Amino acid sequence: MRTDLEKNKHYYAVIFTSNLSNDTTDYSTTSEKMEELAKQQPGFLGVESARDHLGLGITISYWESLEAIENWKTNALHIEAKKRGREQWYENFHLRICLVEKEFKFHKGTL
C-alpha cells in the first residue's frame, strides 16, 4: 500500500467484497488494469487486495474524498469493467464506503 495514507488525517476506504463465478476469462488482466488506472486518479491513496482459493475476495481502496470516489465510479473504463463484472465475473459482491478517522500500525521490532 502507498504511504500517502500517513499524510491524511481522515480519508475514505472503499471495501469491495466479492465471490467469483466460474467464468473468470480476462478477470485477472482487467483487475490489474483497473488497479493501474485507479492509481492515476486524483485523490487515490492506495489499495490492498486478497482472494482465497474459493474465490472470495476483498479489495480495499483508499481515497482522499467522496468526490474522488465518485470520479472513479464514473470513469468510463471502470464503468465497462463493472458491467462485465455483473454480467460475467461475479456471483455476488458487496460495496461499502467508510470514513477512516484513526489508524494504528504495528511493526515487529519497533517501539
Which residues make up each language-model segment?
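Short S/T/G/P-rich N-terminal loop/turn motif that feeds into the first structured element of a domain
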Residues: M1-G57, A68-K73, Y90-L111
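Short loop-to-helix capping motifs
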Residues: E64-L66
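Short, conserved catalytic or adaptor-binding loops enriched in Gly and charged residues
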Residues: G85-Q88
